[in-house]
């Protein structure tokens, strides 16, 4: 089953033939390679000839010798089509030594359109980004959204059941092929997890204590949506008999963020319009992977919903922060250009005290930006002093204004 990732595909189409390097980043197995294949199919259906497309996956042994940047450049240069646009696809390019040199040399040639993918943020770290600064656009890819998951099942009915499936079966695209086979899904997710830990983190970062790395990751997975600091993690693990210092925890967190397995949400002072350095939160790329690592017993449905909403806001192109308003906290402040949106996320607000608790931070914000409470309650939409309470599943499916 090949799931059409329409929103990502449209982004690539919009940048076709533009003098920008298109860089698609995201966790392993989120669908980057399939997206590239779909885009190549689209090109062929829209007047591009096969010889104008050069596609290389650097995790394929057939191309192993091309991980040397000189050989790669020679290979590509020999295959450029004179007087026509050549579309170059470089999948998992982080395996190529000094790859920016290749991209830089190709970029200055006429009629070359470059697309690259990578499974860790290191490929766009400061020194690399400097070499291609101002000449690339980054498209950040995530596993399936709830809407994509629903569409891939062929029906938009039974939203409640499918939401549970979406969480438990995983949002990684191939997990749909394994639906109904929980042991196979677990093995599949375990394989992704171990590849990330071994290939993308331990080997490249030269980390010598894989058990401690996994302990840090488990702690973050177990505390999604809770304020965390490196010191708090270090103190907790040390008190449990696994001694670790703050600097090591910081290094491990950086590596996990770089591999797209966890995402940080920095705190933001809404009234002072300042970014705060302390007690941010972390969210995981896939709840199914969290279940795999921690077990189903760790349900924590409220924070799981919060995690799903956070990822959806990222998909929609927002920078997402945890809001601080006086002594109150707003779950999410979502910013994009001049637009700002505020979100509270709760399983239910049918209880009057819970509703007031969720409303209070939003009512404390004295601006005119939209404010929402997202809840799993199936009650009709309601407004409280301009604050909209809407069903979270409807919001995830794009069924609300």
Where do the protein language model's features map onto the residues?
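Interdomain motor-coupling "hinge/lid" segment immediately C-terminal to the ATP-binding subdomain
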Residues: 119-121, 125-227, 260-263
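Accessory nucleic acid-recognition modules appended to NTPase machines
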Residues: 180-340
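Pre-Walker A adenine-sensing motif
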Residues: 3-17
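Short glycine-rich substrate-engagement loop in P-loop NTPases that contacts/grips substrate
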Residues: 55-83
């Amino acid at each position: 089953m090949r799931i059409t990732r329409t929103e990502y595909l449209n982004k690539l189409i919009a940048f076709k033939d533009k003098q920008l390097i298109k860089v698609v980043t995201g966790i392993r197995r989120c669908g980057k390679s399939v997206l590239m294949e779909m885009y190549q199919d689209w090109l062929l259906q829209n007047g591009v000839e096969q010889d104008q497309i050069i596609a290389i996956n650097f995790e394929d042994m057939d191309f192993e010798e091309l991980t040397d940047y000189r050989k790669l450049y020679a290979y590509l240069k020999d295959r450029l089509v004179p007087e026509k646009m050549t579309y170059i696809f470089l999948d998992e390019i982080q395996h190529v030594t000094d790859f920016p040199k290749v991209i830089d040399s190709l970029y200055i040639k006429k009629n070359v359109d470059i697309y690259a993918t990578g499974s860790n943020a290191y490929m766009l770290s400061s020194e690399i980004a400097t070499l291609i600064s101002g000449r690339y656009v980054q498209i950040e890819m995530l596993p399936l959204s709830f809407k994509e998951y629903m569409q891939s099942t062929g029906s938009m009915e039974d939203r409640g059941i499918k939401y549970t499936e979406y969480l438990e079966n995983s949002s990684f695209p191939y997990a749909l092929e394994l639906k109904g086979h929980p042991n196979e899904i677990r093995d599949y997710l375990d394989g992704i997890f171990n590849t990330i830990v071994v290939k993308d983190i331990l080997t490249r970062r030269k980390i010598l204590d894989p058990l401690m790395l996994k302990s840090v990751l488990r702690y973050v997975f177990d505390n999604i949506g809770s304020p965390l600091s490196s010191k708090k993690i270090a103190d907790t693990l040390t008190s449990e008999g696994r001694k670790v210092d703050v600097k090591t925890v910081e290094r491990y967190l950086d590596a996990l963020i770089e591999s797209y397995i966890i995402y940080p949400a920095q705190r933001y002072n809404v009234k002072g319009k300042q970014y705060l350095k302390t007690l941010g939160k972390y969210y995981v790329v896939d709840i199914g992977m969290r279940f795999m690592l921690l077990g189903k017993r760790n349900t924590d449905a409220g924070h799981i919903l919060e995690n799903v909403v956070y990822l959806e806001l990222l998909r929609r192109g927002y920078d997402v922060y945890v809001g601080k308003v006086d002594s109150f906290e707003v779950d999410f402040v979502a910013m994009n250009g001049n637009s700002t949106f505020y979100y509270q996320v709760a399983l239910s607000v049918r209880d009057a005290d819970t509703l007031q608790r969720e409303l209070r931070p939003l009512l404390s914000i004295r601006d005119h930006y939209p404010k929402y409470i997202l809840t799993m309650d199936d009650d009709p939409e309601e407004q409280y002093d301009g604050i909209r309470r809407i069903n979270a599943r409807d919001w995830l499916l794009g069924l609300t204004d």
